[in-house]
């Protein structure tokens, strides 16, 4: 869904072309779009690079798309590099601005210009471009080092104290520093990691909106802008041990007081951010980018603590809050993801989610396996073939065959190049990590577990079963995760969900839609729910079937597939919790040049939205 066509025009790659002209002393146009618009281009480059590393397995559409990506990268990369200033600085809004307007870079009065936000996305795009080319094309990598060196030369102890209004540079610098060390050795990237910590430590005497209200070590409640917050917490979890007390408290506050059942965050009271504890309005916020940030945070926590509960949660967020952020054709997207109402749009005046959604989804292989403690952690169950390098001195191919999340049977073939002894840690899903929600019936553990047909003892530690043995090519792990329809009740402190129930099957949260039943504001009946596969519906989904209290049939579909059918216009409002609009500059389409076209109608309280809800009335 990454719109390379829309990044061609104003606010896109053209800004780099004009900045290069300015650096050459040629006549040029001014910067177009938001001051941080470079970020959309960098996100798009990163997404194209990751997508180009996917094995198409002969799929003609994927091959065609990858050819288009290569053509676009060949066009864009020289333009991006040409816009980099001689000292390594890169942000076209500054290069193209009057120095009377912005007399200095890294100005504390101009934190909203997002210098680190755009620079961080550039660095992350360079990492993936280097990886895509197997280090054969170092153009972006070298440019990213030049940029990072520029920041190190200007910011740091004894130089200048500063922090950005929108975090991203911090986690990018940590990632890049470690990547440079892996590629070049000798601690070449250490200065970048140190700068990341310095930028975090500079955050104080500011606003809770951008998490600078108190030093990061003293932050224990998630506040402010949800995307900025999760990027901040992700970097904290990754970079230093002395942040861990705060990080654990922040994680606990999010998951047990500010976490939607879909895995989304941010109820919107604080301008695209967190509200008070237990304030989880169903018509509100849940920005797609905040879900991306939460996934990054959960992943970093999983890396730090090797506890499966973090993977349980990023699986929830991935399947529900993020996967459903696009329509099934990948042509429209949600900037916000309210649990009732809302319609996707083709573009937005601030299209940060357009690049963030695909780059995060394309990182699924990263979320699936983690290598550490002399073994391999299996965190997600997805039919796939992935190579894990240097496990106990050998490379290991992991082949998963599964229809999860439609059923719970999983087979993993372990193919080390050479027979070696190591552990494979199998995640045992737990749907009860958040204290905000209780499920009926309770489901836990594994139904069975075997290696090469021989039953294994199921002993769970921190959410994993460790299977340690001398592995040889062809060894097969087989297990089954129990999958039954469940009803979910929310903590009574969540006023918006009192008297309501949600439905779940495995990791999937379900919606009821007017496309399947006319009245979705009535109470659900007490009859058992049944899972039924519908290959003819929404590209193939497992539906849940039951009865409403009046005996009429009830059909529920996975939340990710919501609002993909025509004719869903009227908002379904449950318990007086109405849809809240955050679309702002959302547009229903674009002009040929990629600029915004017809504005979508604003939807305030009680306005139009989709006939689809997560929470439905419980039978009293």
Locate the predicted segments by residue.
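Long, well-ordered core segments of solenoidal/helical folds
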Residues: 1-27, 72-89, 142-158, 194-212, ...
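A surface-exposed regulatory interaction patch that couples sensing to output
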Residues: 207-224
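Substrate-binding cleft and catalytic face of glycoside hydrolase catalytic domains
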Residues: 83, 88-97, 129-130
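C-terminal beta-rich recognition modules with glycine/proline-rich loops and embedded aromatic residues
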Residues: 4, 247, 312-320, 325-415, ...
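Aromatic (Trp/Tyr) and acidic
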Residues: 1-63, 67, 71, 101-134, ...
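Extracellular Ig-like/FN3 beta-sandwich strand-entry sites
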Residues: 421, 474-476
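Asp-box/WD-like beta-propeller blade repeats and closely related beta-sheet repeat scaffolds
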Residues: 95-116, 123, 137-164
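Flexible glycine/proline-rich, aromatic-decorated loop/lid segments
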Residues: 259-276
């Amino acid at each position: 869904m990454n719109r390379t066509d829309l990044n061609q025009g104003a606010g896109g790659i053209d800004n780099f072309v004009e900045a290069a002209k300015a650096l050459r002393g040629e006549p040029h146009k001014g910067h177009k779009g938001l001051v941080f618009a470079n970020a959309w281009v960098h996100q798009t480059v990163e997404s194209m690079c990751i997508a180009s590393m996917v094995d198409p397995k002969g799929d003609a559409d994927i091959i065609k798309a990858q050819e288009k990506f290569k053509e676009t990268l060949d066009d864009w990369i020289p333009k991006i590099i040409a816009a980099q200033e001689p000292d390594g600085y890169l942000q076209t809004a500054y290069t193209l601005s009057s120095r009377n307007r912005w007399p200095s870079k890294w100005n504390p009065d101009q934190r909203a210009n997002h210098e680190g936000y755009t620079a961080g996305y550039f660095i992350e795009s360079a990492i993936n471009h280097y990886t895509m080319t197997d280090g054969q094309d170092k153009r972006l990598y070298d440019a990213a080092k030049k940029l990072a060196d520029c920041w190190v030369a200007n910011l740091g102890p004894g130089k200048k104290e500063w922090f950005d209004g929108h975090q991203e540079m911090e986690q990018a610098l940590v990632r890049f520093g470690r990547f440079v060390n892996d590629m070049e050795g000798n601690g070449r990237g250490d200065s970048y990691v140190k700068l990341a910590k310095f930028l975090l430590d500079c955050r104080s005497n500011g606003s809770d909106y951008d998490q600078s209200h108190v030093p990061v070590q003293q932050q224990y409640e998630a506040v402010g802008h949800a995307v900025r917050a999760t990027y901040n917490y992700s970097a904290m979890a990754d970079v230093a041990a002395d942040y861990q007390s705060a990080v654990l408290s922040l994680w606990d506050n999010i998951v047990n007081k500010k976490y939607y059942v879909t895995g989304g965050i941010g109820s919107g009271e604080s301008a695209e951010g967190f509200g008070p504890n237990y304030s989880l309005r169903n018509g509100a916020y849940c920005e797609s980018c905040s879900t991306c940030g939460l996934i990054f945070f959960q992943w970093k926590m999983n890396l730090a603590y090797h506890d499966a509960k973090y993977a349980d949660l990023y699986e929830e967020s991935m399947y529900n809050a993020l996967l459903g952020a696009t329509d099934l054709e990948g042509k429209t997207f949600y900037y916000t993801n309210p649990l009732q109402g809302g319609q996707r749009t083709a573009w937005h005046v601030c299209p940060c989610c357009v690049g963030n959604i695909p780059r995060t989804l394309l990182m699924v292989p990263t979320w699936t396996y983690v290598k550490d403690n002399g073994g391999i952690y299996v965190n997600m169950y997805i039919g796939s073939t992935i190579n894990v390098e240097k496990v106990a001195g050998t490379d290991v191919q992991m082949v998963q065959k599964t229809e999860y999340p439609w059923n719970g049977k999983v087979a993993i073939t372990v193919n080390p190049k050479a027979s070696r002894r190591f552990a494979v840690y199998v995640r045992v899903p737990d749907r009860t990590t958040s204290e905000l929600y209780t499920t009926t019936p309770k489901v836990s553990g594994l139904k069975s577990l075997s290696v090469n047909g021989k039953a294994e003892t199921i002993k769970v530690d921190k959410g994993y079963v460790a299977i340690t043995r001398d592995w040889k090519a062809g060894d097969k792990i087989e297990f089954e995760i129990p999958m039954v329809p469940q009803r979910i009740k929310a903590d009574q402190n969540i006023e918006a969900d009192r008297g309501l129930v949600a439905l779940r099957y495995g990791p999937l949260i379900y919606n009821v839609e007017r496309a399947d039943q006319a009245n979705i504001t009535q109470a659900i009946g007490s009859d058992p729910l049944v899972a039924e596969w519908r290959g003819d519906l929404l590209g193939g989904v497992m539906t849940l079937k039951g009865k409403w209290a009046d005996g009429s049939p009830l059909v529920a579909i996975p939340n990710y597939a919501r609002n993909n059918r025509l004719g869903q216009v009227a908002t379904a409002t449950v318990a007086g919790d109405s849809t809240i609009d955050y679309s702002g500059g959302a547009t229903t389409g674009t002009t040929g040049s990629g600029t915004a076209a017809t504005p979508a109608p604003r939807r305030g309280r009680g306005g139009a939205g989709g006939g689809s809800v997560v929470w439905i009335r419980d039978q009293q």
